[in-house]
Regions:
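Short, charged/polar, Gly/Pro-enriched secondary-structure boundary elements
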Residues: 157-162, 355, 402-409
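Core structural elements
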Residues: 146-149, 340-354, 397-406
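C-terminal hydrophobic structural anchor segments
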Residues: 379-434
Length: 471
């Protein structure tokens, strides 16, 4: 079969468990609603038309045709009045006849739009992690995100299901069903499981491409399924590791399907796409070198923060306050990681009313993790590109890392001043580490334009908690 003798490849019994519409399901359960039968949407900043849809129940998606990650203005109704939006409907090519309008307005009235509660989602996630640990040791569990994770059940199958008449495939299915049952009984949340008696990659592909559409919400893809199932994935972007940009690059090479990728020349792929091309070739053939205990980790490309502002920022001083705060927040993360940056980048997105492209710019710098120096670089980049206009989103990113011990001091540097700043910076970081980011704030944090205090109450940019740099 193909290039590989799969009998020589590593074999593990993997379950990849995904919580169905996790945030929305948690909100439904907390309100005594059935997660699959209620129309509910978790929306950040629902008080304005740019509210971000973070999650939605399956019924919400079915009725309004919206998946996760969208905007309030993408919905066919006004979130405040719950009336049909003819403007949005026409823009999206939706019908506007009276029956459809009535259908949307009736469901809009019955739909719950709720703010995110990240602390609640984390608490439920911890409960689910404890369920996982009933079936495998902590070393056998790899959380992939807050709502999904891998469990290596290789050493657990025979312990929980000693029946020798059953195949490992059957045992994996039985044990995965028990995990689903326990999650539902203890949290009220439904889960989907991708399984594989081969490796984590095939378990992930089974989840994304089959398990979500089966009555049991489980599916198993192993080595014997590569040609029939993996090669038959209809959209290349449904394959792990292929986004729109990579898809275009593959198309340029004359590759338009997973089968064509799997049967292409690996040397040519490596020449055109580097190691990423070679890795995709292996994956298209069902080969995955990672495992749950030592998962593949991509090289860190950078550290950054970005945010959508609650209103349009027009005044230059207000925009500078935001950029200063973000430069400092990312600098804190940089020092925590024991690194210095050699490349500073910023992103500035304009308001919808501004007909102009976003600003993307960067500059190479001498290795540093000094807040004051990095802030100066960020502001310099901004002033070099910005002339005028209302701003609605900003981002700051540091990359090109070197070890913290690396440093270059020129004859023109004030060494005493640099050492003094470093000691002060270390002291500030230590205080914030122990007492929280807001224990020490600059005076401009009290200004109306500042976002430091507001974002200190967030987790992952949403309600409850804080950013890494805003502990």
């Amino acid at each position: 079969m193909g290039y590989f003798d799969y009998s020589r490849e590593p074999q593990s019994d993997i379950a990849f468990v995904d919580m169905k519409s996790f945030y929305a399901s948690v909100e439904c359960v907390k309100r005594g609603l059935h997660p699959l039968k209620a129309s509910l949407c978790v929306m950040s900043r629902a008080d304005n038309s740019t509210g971000l849809i973070l999650a939605s129940s399956p019924l919400f998606k079915k009725i309004f045709g919206k998946s996760n990650v969208g905007r309030a203005y993408d919905l066919p109704f006004d979130i405040k009045t719950r009336k049909f939006s003819y403007y949005n409907a026409r823009k999206q090519g939706l019908p506007t006849d009276s029956d459809y309008v009535r259908y949307i307005e009736d469901w809009a009235q019955a739909t719950l739009i709720v703010p995110p509660r990240m602390d609640e989602y984390i608490a439920v996630n911890m409960e689910i992690q404890r369920i996982f640990q009933n079936y495998g040791s902590p070393d056998d569990i790899y959380p992939y995100s807050i709502d999904e994770g891998f469990i290596d059940l290789t050493s657990s199958l025979n312990y929980f299901i000693p029946d020798k008449s059953l195949s490992r495939k059957d045992k994996l299915d039985i044990l995965s069903a028990r995990i689903q049952r326990d999650i539902w009984r203890q949290t009220g949340i439904y889960s989907t499981v991708g399984m594989s008696n081969a490796n984590p990659l095939l378990a992930k592909l089974a989840l994304d491409n089959e398990a979500k559409h089966t009555p049991t919400m489980r599916a198993n893809w192993s080595y014997q399924d590569v040609e029939e199932k993996v090669w038959s994935i209809p959209k290349m972007t449904d394959f792990w590791g292929i986004g729109r940009r990579m898809e275009k690059r593959l198309h340029a090479l004359g590759i338009f399907s997973i089968k064509e990728l799997a049967t292409s020349n690996p040397d040519q792929l490596k020449k055109a796409l580097g190691q990423a091309g070679l890795r995709l070739w292996f994956h298209a053939n069902g080969i995955d070198e990672s495992n749950v205990h030592k998962p593949y980790k991509a090289k860190t490309k950078g550290l950054g923060n970005s945010q959508i502002l609650p209103r349009d920022y027009v005044k230059l001083r207000d925009i500078e306050i935001i950029l200063r705060e973000m430069a400092e927040q990312v600098a804190i993360r940089l020092r925590r990681s024991g690194k210095k940056t050699t490349l500073v980048s910023i992103y500035v997105g304009f308001s919808k009313q501004e007909v102009r492209p976003s600003i993307h710019t960067q500059m190479k710098v001498e290795p540093t993790n000094n807040t004051a120096i990095l802030t100066d670089y960020v502001l310099k980049l901004f002033h070099n590109k910005y002339t005028s206009g209302a701003i609605r989103s900003v981002g700051v990113n540091y990359s090109g890392f070197v070890d913290e011990s690396f440093g270059l001091i020129s004859l023109f540097d004030d060494v005493d001043k640099l050492e003094k700043e470093e000691r002060l910076q270390t002291a500030i970081d230590a205080i914030r580490e122990q007492f929280g980011f807001t224990s020490l704030l600059k005076a401009n944090a009290l200004e109306e334009a500042s976002r430091s205090l507001a974002r200190s109450k967030l987790i992952g940019g949403h309600s409850a908690g804080g950013l890494d740099g805003l502990k």
